[in-house]
């Protein structure tokens, strides 16, 4: 077995020393083969001596198996071997190391630089020209994060805009917000992201309080001023079409009825009742009859000015 290993190991050395001729020699390649000759391989260890024959045999048995899979299986088989089975390969590795030291006394192992790991580290770092001369990469990353947070708060929805709006309202609360009328209005929807104009909120409250009034009651004046001040603060009051509080309803209804009666009594003849529908109809007919009498000519005929 040792003689077979010696022949396998000596043949590559002889082949590497053979093409030393010039460019005119048939086997030599001239100066192109000098870097290959200067590179000296490391001596094989015990595992490499053992796996050399085993690798060739396994590759012949499994031609489609990848070389990495073969190496994994050979490493597992090598660990299963006992010390007595490993002894001849260990001795052969020692002999090859001694021969290598005699042939290359000035040999020094110089491993190649692993450029892949360096590329991975430099992949996520910015070039030096993009940064300011006095700014470190850590400080620049912190500045970028703060800038992103600043722009994220502008849209009003992300990054807890609801909690931000509530904090602002907590520090500057209007005294009118603690009134029972405003608590009844705000109990349904209070969202910090949307914003309505104060005119829209006051108009909605006005439509819910009194639909056909011409004068605003004192209670409504106080309520609308509170709503407008709340809208100017930036909060949202979305009032659905529901019944207003009972106290405000009775007060506004009385004011509305009084105003309507005053307006209707202006057009009724004296002695008429505004609540009587027959008197209303007769007053309308009487006013129409007077209109046509005033428009008639001296002969009692209506002038044909409309033709």
Curated annotation (Swiss-Prot):
Keyword tRNA processing set for record: no
Annotated stretches, region: Disordered: 1-41
Motif 9aaTAD location, chain numbering: 259-270
Pfam families: HMG_box (PF00505), SOXp (PF12336)
DNA-binding region: 40-108
Biased composition (Gly residues): 21-30
InterPro entries for this protein: HMG_box_dom, HMG_box_dom_sf, SOX_fam, SRY-related_HMG-box_TF-like
One example of a Gene Ontology biological process annotation: negative regulation of DNA-templated transcription
Subcellular location(s) of the protein: Nucleus; Cytoplasm
Presence of keyword Nucleus: yes
Cellular component GO terms held in the UniProt record: cytoplasm; nucleus
Gene Ontology terms, MF aspect: beta-catenin binding; sequence-specific DNA binding
Principal cellular location given in the protein's record: nucleus
Function: Transcription factor with sequence-specific DNA binding activity. Binds to the consensus sequence 5'-[AT][AT]CAA[AT]G-3', showing a preference for 5'-AACAAT-3' and 5'-AACAAAG-3'. Inhibits beta-catenin-mediated dorsal axis specification by binding to sites within the promoter of the beta-catenin-regulated gene nodal5. Maternally derived sox3 acts as a transcriptional repressor of nodal5 and nodal6 to restrict their expression to the vegetal hemisphere of early embryos and thus establish germ layer formation.
PANTHER family: SOX TRANSCRIPTION FACTOR (PTHR10270), TRANSCRIPTION FACTOR SOX-3 (PTHR10270:SF329)
Free-text note on domains in this protein's UniProt record: The 9aaTAD motif is a transactivation domain present in a large number of yeast and animal transcription factors.
Oligomeric form and interacting partners: Interacts with ctnnb1.
Identification of the protein by name: Transcription factor Sox-3
């Amino acid at each position: 077995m040792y003689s077979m290993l010696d022949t396998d190991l000596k043949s590559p050395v002889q082949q590497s020393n053979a093409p030393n001729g010039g460019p005119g020699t048939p086997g030599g390649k001239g100066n192109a083969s000098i870097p290959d000759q200067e590179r000296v391989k490391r001596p094989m260890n015990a595992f490499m001596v053992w796996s050399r024959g085993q690798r060739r045999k396994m590759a012949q048995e499994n031609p489609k198996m990848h070389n990495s899979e073969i190496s994994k299986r050979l490493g597992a088989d090598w660990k299963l071997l006992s010390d007595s089975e490993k002894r001849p390969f260990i001795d052969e590795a020692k002999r090859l190391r001694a021969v290598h030291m005699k042939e290359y006394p000035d040999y020094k192992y110089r491993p190649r630089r692993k450029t892949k790991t360096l590329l991975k580290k430099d992949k996520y770092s910015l070039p030096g020209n993009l940064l300011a001369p006095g700014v470190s990469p850590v400080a620049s990353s912190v500045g970028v994060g703060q800038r992103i947070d600043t722009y994220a708060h502008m849209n009003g929805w992300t990054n807890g805009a609801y909690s931000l709006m509530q904090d602002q309202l907590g520090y500057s609360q209007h005294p009118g917000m603690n009134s029972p009328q405003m608590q009844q209005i705000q109990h349904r929807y209070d969202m910090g992201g949307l914003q309505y104009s104060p005119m829209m909120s006051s108009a909605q409250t006005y439509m819910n309080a009194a639909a056909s009034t011409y004068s605003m009651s004192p209670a409504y004046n106080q309520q609308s001023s509170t709503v407008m001040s709340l809208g100017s603060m930036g909060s949202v009051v979305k009032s659905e079409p529901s019944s207003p509080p009972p106290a405000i309803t009775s007060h506004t209804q009385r004011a509305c009825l009084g105003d309507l009666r005053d307006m209707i009594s202006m057009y009724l003849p004296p002695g008429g009742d505004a609540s009587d529908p027959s008197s209303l109809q007769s007053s309308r007919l009487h006013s129409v009859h007077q209109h046509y009498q005033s428009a008639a000519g001296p002969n009692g005929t209506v002038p044909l000015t409309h033709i």
